[in-house]
């Protein structure tokens, strides 16, 4: 059930990120609350793992502040939410996978379009990364 929730959340967030370049705050809040409730009901991961998962998103938000918004705060909020569900290690894998996929895409855009300053939504790469992690 959690996997379907995560996939559904990332699909909705990806669509929003592509269309509007922002992610609905209410979507992030609702998904986060559901994750916290499931954490206490299912007790599938340790509190330490939960906190490490949250920390990854917090670090992305800090990077957003340091880079003056070059990295979106919404991306960090998404990773905070996924951290509640996935824990530290898998959330880190999700982030690294998303970064690798977006880097590959950026290289292809650079090679074929030569538009270096194009803004690219990040959440769709997190969705693809999550699907790959679930397949492997």
Set out the residue ranges of the language-model regions.
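A membrane-topology feature that recognizes alpha-helical transmembrane segments
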Residues: 1-136
